[in-house]
Amino acid sequence: MITRMQIRIQRTHPQAILPTYAHGPAEDAGMDLHAVEDVTLEPGVARLVSTGLTLEVPPGFEAQVRPRSGLALKHAITIPNAPGTIDPGYRGEVRVIMLNLGRDAYTVHAGDRIAQMIVTRYEAVEWLEGSLADSTRGAGGFGSSGR
């Protein structure tokens, strides 16, 4: 079952486009974020791309910013800090760090879909310091499960 929540949003740029579900929330978990400016990404260079939006994420939730698979596959464009987190207390503009891993320059145009945003619940953690329970895996990591 899909529940709906309301989140306050403000456009800080006249060309800003509200985040949208391409196929509706029953089929898409992520909403598309759009650029409000033209930005050329040179190979090997990361740039901040503006969305012209500010959010008021409710306490107990975060908004995660993730790459779009089509940009990654077709143009080798990614988001190096993915998933980027928009915390409940942040009120600045949502901007996306975009990195061109390809060989050719890529230009993002105003209105282009540049990332996906997912709003998800998180839990506050209280640490219980002490020894840990045994497990089958133990301290094995970094390829310990085989090829």
UniProtKB/Swiss-Prot annotation:
Question: What is the catalytic activity of this protein?
Answer: dUTP + H2O = dUMP + diphosphate + H(+)
Which pathway does UniProt place it in? Pyrimidine metabolism; dUMP biosynthesis; dUMP from dCTP (dUTP route): step 2/2
- Entry keyword set: Hydrolase, Magnesium, Metal-binding, Nucleotide metabolism
Molecular function in Gene Ontology: dUTP diphosphatase activity; magnesium ion binding
Residues annotated as binding substrate are 68-70, 81, 85-87
What are the recorded Gene Ontology BP terms?
dUMP biosynthetic process; dUTP catabolic process
SUPFAM superfamilies, sorted: dUTPase-like
Keyword Nuclease assigned to the entry: answer is no
Enzyme Commission number, as recorded: 3.6.1.23
Which cofactors is this protein said to need? Mg(2+)
EC top class, in one word? hydrolase
Entry's Pfam families?
dUTPase
Supply the NCBIfam families for this chain: dut (TIGR00576), PRK00601.1 (NF001862)
The entry assigns this protein to a family as follows: Belongs to the dUTPase family.
Do you know which PANTHER family this protein is assigned to? DEOXYURIDINE 5'-TRIPHOSPHATE NUCLEOTIDOHYDROLASE (PTHR11241:SF0)
Functional note: This enzyme is involved in nucleotide metabolism: it produces dUMP, the immediate precursor of thymidine nucleotides and it decreases the intracellular concentration of dUTP so that uracil cannot be incorporated into DNA.
Q: What is this protein called?
A: Deoxyuridine 5'-triphosphate nucleotidohydrolase
- What organism does this protein naturally occur in? Solibacter usitatus (strain Ellin6076)
Q: Please spell out the taxonomic lineage of the organism that makes this protein.
A: Bacteria, Pseudomonadati, Acidobacteriota, Terriglobia, Bryobacterales
